Amino acid sequence: GELYPTNPTNLVGELQSLLEQAKVEPPQTPAASEQPSGDLYKFLYTAGLSDEANAQCVNRLYQGQFLYNDAFGWLFWTGSHWTKEGAEAALDRATVTTLLSRIEAASQPETFEEGGKVRRFCLPNKGRVQGAEHMLSSLVISQPGEFDTEPDLLNCGNGVVDLRSGKLIAHDPGQRFTYCSPVDYKPGASSEQWVSFLEAAVGAEQAA
């Protein structure tokens, strides 16, 4: 039988509460790139009943936020760089939130009557979460050699500096950095103190 109350209004309210709870931990919980509504609800509802379908839904909701390769395992986009730290926990939260979003999509007034199979299939549990994540790994595969390969680019707190031109570039997941300098780049900052240090350390001729 149905595991949820028969009143769709009550169910949606309960699911919204669960979705909020799913987002509060761990600290590095990713934000969905789309909020469930309209076409996205349709995608989540009609994706199918398989681990692959759940993986496709995670990939749609969290596009560009996770990568996988055999050397590093799971990587998570922090907004400035890719990191292994907390990546698996962040992925678990993203997967649980996706499953709850699929249940929510199957609990709308227009989908509630026929949505029982989706609601039952997408109940978050260890097997369902791990199955989706296993299938997701091949959708977001990367190669270890893709990372930190740009010697002329420096990743700073407020963007990426092109050392050849001094131009500041916005952070982007396509930039495969696994580090981020804790300081911001200031284009107009004076280098006088740094030059003075070099001159004192190695001599004016070598510093020049």
Roles of regions detected by a PLM:
Residues 33-57, 115-160, 164:
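Extended, Lys/Arg-enriched charged tracts that mediate electrostatic binding to polyanionic substrates
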Residues 103-135, 190-195, 199-206:
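A short, charged
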Residues 7, 49, 204-205:
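Short, solvent-exposed helix-helix connector turns and helix-capping sites enriched
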Residues 65-90, 112, 147-148, 153-154, ...:
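P-loop NTPase catalytic core of nucleic-acid-dependent motor ATPases
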Residues 3, 14, 18-21, 57-61, ...:
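Residues that form generic nucleotide/phosphate-binding pockets
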Residues 1-40, 68-107:
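Modules that initiate DNA replication and primer synthesis
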Residues 8, 12, 51-55, 88-92, ...:
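Alpha-helix initiation and N-capping motif
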Residues 54-68:
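Basic chromatin DNA-binding modules
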